[in-house]
Amino acid sequence: MAAAWLVVLLTVHRLLHLSGVSAVDRSQFPPDFLFGTSSSAYQVEGGYLEGNKGLSNWDVFTHKQGTIEDGSNGDTANDHYHRYMEDIELMHSLGVNSYRFSISWARILPKGRFGDVNPDGVAFYNALIDGLVQKGIQPFVTICHYDIPHELDERYGGWLSPEIQKDFSYFAEVCFKLFGDRIKFWTTFNQPNLSIKFSYMDGFYSPGRCSEPFGKCALGNSSIEPYVAGHNIILSHANAVSVYRNKYQGKQGGQIGIALSITWYEPFRNTTIDLLAVKRALSFGASWFLDPILLGDYPTEMREVLGQSLPKFTSKQKNRLQSTKLDFIGLNHYTTCYVKDCIFSPCEIDPVNADARVFSLYERDGVPIGKATGAPFFHDVPRGMEEAVTYYKQRYNNTPTYITENGYSQASNSNMTAKDFTNDTGRITYIQGYLISLASAIRKGADVRGYFVWSLLDDFEWNFGYTLRFGLYHVHYKTLKRTPKLSVDWYRKFLTGSLLRRKFRDESQLHKFNSY
């Protein structure tokens, strides 16, 4: 391990020397700053029919042919349902002080509000939460991370029906009542601004609805359904916050927010139309949800482009939104890209930003915007972290913020072994760069209070299945063995404040490094 760490140290020193940036250290962040890892129920738990759990929308979707790139599913995933104590020990040895996870709606309420609370599901999450607390790890809980009971899709169409607002409020209150005495941080939803587009515009995610030219699905309307679903999520969020504020927050002392996906955008060309394209891309991104929640209505750019396709809030709904403002914003940031205008210029269909009438690009004049990662749509562009955090700081009056996801992907296939993944210097460089950028934003006044690496373990990555690996720990999916990657040692040393403070005892090693 000592030799391996020396390789990491030399690599990071070299990269910093070449880039001219300073090393990042734990002392550059506030003492009470949360540092953790993130996950979600469907991606790690497995046990999909155990403990009287009901079917979720993702249980059904992944069993349909052609929905997942490698034909896989989350039936077993990382088997966190049975191995959660082992995973808590990994977190404890890593040195994190928080763990962000989600609660499986179908494990707690197999039939939504149309059935009983499942005591086996409650027992599992009580055991997980208690295990974390005993190790000094703060639970940071997402109420809904994509998965909903299949019953609700079957009964009334899931997020396309206003009925789901009642179900989500009921589920949220069950969670507050059962777990809120130990949970100090709640997020209602995880990045619905991204998942809704993939679910109802492109058809990549459950329930797989879309229409041409966005995709060729059996059912759906890509021009209308994403905004209907998004509207119901915003109102569901407001209702859940209202329940928490009025009945639980005073005695439980927690906070509640929402997590959104935030890609940072730069103009492809420094022209008026591409600068406007950046503005539209941002408005159709996190601001699609944050503007109504914090400012009372949808962004002007969305209304101008979508017209009557964008639902309207009633006066009563606006009052509810204004009276239930969140305590913090969660930002999931992975990458930066260029965008060009598609209103005055011909474009291909962009799977994420077509509704904003922009097209995303990852190189300009043959030069990549940043180093590619294992995910084709994520590039390593650290400056985007500071730019994005600063933008949302200014737009939303410096609302307290947590970086709820940030991570690096390695491409994977069945012929690769653990050794192909454990020497993950690319991940170390990525996290280091983004933390440097985040620390700069904090020094300039951004009220950021936590950072979570995605993810603790390699896991099921939605429509990509197991072809992408984001974990600090490698998971062998046949044996489920967890193996630390080099980034584990890096993150541990960062958290203990010893990163890059180790001195070379052998001056010849330093000479060798300088000539590397």
UniProtKB/Swiss-Prot annotation:
Glycans are attached at N193, N221, N270, N415, N423. This is Probable inactive beta-glucosidase 14. GO terms for molecular function: beta-D-fucosidase activity; beta-galactosidase activity; beta-glucosidase activity. The active site is at E405 (nucleophile). Belongs to the glycosyl hydrolase 1 family. It comes from Oryza sativa subsp. japonica (Rice). PROSITE patterns: GLYCOSYL_HYDROL_F1_2. The gene is BGLU14. The keyword Signal applies.
